[in-house]
C-alpha cells in the first residue's frame, strides 16, 4: 500500500491506498492524483453553481471544514464542472425532433463588479419515443436573427437534420432564422404568450370579456371557425384595443398552425409550458 493524506469533511485523513503489480488499480473514493474526497469536491461544485466566487468558496471551506484551499485550487476543481458543461452542450443529438420548444429565462448576474441582465435561451426537443430532452442553453443579451440562426445552426452541426414544429414566443427574427435553418419546419407562436401580450394594456373590467373572446379563437375546431372568432374579436375590441387585434391579424398564420392537428396534441404544440416548468425548476437552484 501507499500512504496518502486526503482532505475530507472530517479533516485530513491518512489513507493507505492498495497497489497492484501492474499499477492499474484506481480507487473510486479517492481517484489517482486526487487529494480530496469526492464529497468535498461535490460541496465545492455546489457552492460554485450557486454563484459563489472562488475566494468566497475558499473562505467557506476553511470556516466549515477547517481546510485551507487557495482560490487557484478551487478553480482547478470548478474547471472540471465547466468541462462537463461543455461536453453536455456539444453532445450529439437525434436526427429528427417532431417538436422543439424555445423560450428564455432572465437573470440578474454579477459581471465586472456590477449587476447586469442576462437571458438564457432554453431549447427542449420532443424525441420520437415521446421523451423530452433539453438540447442546450445559450446566454444572450439581444434578440436577433443572427443569434437565432447561430443556435439553430449549432443544433444542425450536432446532428439535427429535421424539425417538424418549432413552438416559441414571438421572438424578433426567429421565424426568419427557422426558415433558413429548417425550411420545412412549421413555426407556432405560443398562444399563452400571445394572450399575455394582448392583455398588457387591457383594463381590469374588460379582461374577463376579452379573454372569453380570445378563447373562442384558440379553442375553435378549425381554422375557418377561428377566423370567424377573430372577426368577432375585432368587431368587439378594435376601437378600444386595436394593438391586440393587429397582433393577432399580423401573426395569424404562425398562431394557427396547431389547428391543423388533432385536438389531442394541440396543447402540446401551442404552448411553451414545458419550458416554463423547466425554468421554474432552474430558479430553485439558481
Cite the ranges covered by each PLM segment.
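Alpha-helix N-cap/N′ positions at the starts of helices
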Residues: 35-40, 209
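Conserved beta-strand -> loop -> alpha-helix junction used to position metal-binding or nucleic-acid-contacting
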Residues: 165-171, 177-213
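Acidic/histidine-rich catalytic cores and adjacent linkers
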Residues: 219-286
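A polyampholytic, Gly/Pro-enriched intrinsically disordered region
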Residues: 96, 205-222
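RNase H-like nuclease fold core
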Residues: 1, 12, 16-21, 28-34, ...
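Short, amphipathic alpha-helical "recognition" segments used to contact nucleic acids or chromatin
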Residues: 39-51
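DNA-recognition alpha helix
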Residues: 55-66
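Short acidic-hydrophobic surface loop/beta-edge motif
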Residues: 2-8
